Amino acid sequence: MENNDELMPREKLLAFGAKALSDYELLAIFLRTGIKDCPVMSLSKNVLTHFGSLHALLSADKKAFCSVKGLGITQFIQLQAITEMTKRYLKQEMLSTPIINDLETVKLFLLTELQHEEREVFMVLFLDNQHRLIKKERLFLGTINVSAVYPREIIKEALYCNAAALILAHNHPSGITEPSYSDQLITKKIQDAAELMEIRVLDHLIVGKSDCYSFAENCLL
């Protein structure tokens, strides 16, 4: 039974692609084997039930991760390595492709960067005149409101790296991506300051636990 349970997700992936698999099936492939009296598929479901979600599992620190029966330091190290490789892959994709042509890659990148943060983080992507990434910068931490975000600091950094365009981003630790009035006001202030220097604000993305809200897609820019 163990072998059948282990092979089923792999066969499904080969036949239909990784997107066809559930969270626990993907985790089962990662875990590879179960433990005594607990086949890998059951172990995978137990692990996800314990953490509550794939997001919580990936966010767990070493102590919390290794405290779960069937998980250990080896799996923790492997999962951290996979997560970091994903971040680097997405960054390299953004460096080689005009960002404006691939908003989904930007969203995935920002999710890997910000979805696990317990505090609000305001990040800016600085782009060249072909909308390729020059650099990313975390500029403000804590409660993100009009008094905590300084447009002049953003414009100063943009001029320093000769950026022609910006993508703004910040996370909502609550997971709710709907923009507040304060979010809209901050965006307008930055946009006005950028226009004075002939720098475009292409989008402002609010990052939740599993998705992003785009100001541009919702006609708020």
UniProtKB/Swiss-Prot annotation:
Motif (JAMM motif): 170-183
PROSITE patterns, alphabetized: MPN (PS50249), UPF0758 (PS01302)
Residues involved in Zn(2+) binding: 170, 172, 183
Domain of life where this protein originates: Bacteria
InterPro entries: MPN, RadC_JAB, RuvA_2-like, UPF0758, UPF0758_CS, UPF0758_N
MPN domain location: 98-221
UniProt KW ATP-binding keyword: no
Name of a matching Pfam family: RadC
GO MF annotation terms: metal ion binding; metallopeptidase activity
Name assigned to this protein: UPF0758 protein NTHI1125
GO BP, sorted A to Z: proteolysis
Alphabetical UniProt keywords: Hydrolase, Metal-binding, Metalloprotease, Protease, Zinc
Family according to the record: Belongs to the UPF0758 family.
Organism, as annotated: Haemophilus influenzae (strain 86-028NP)
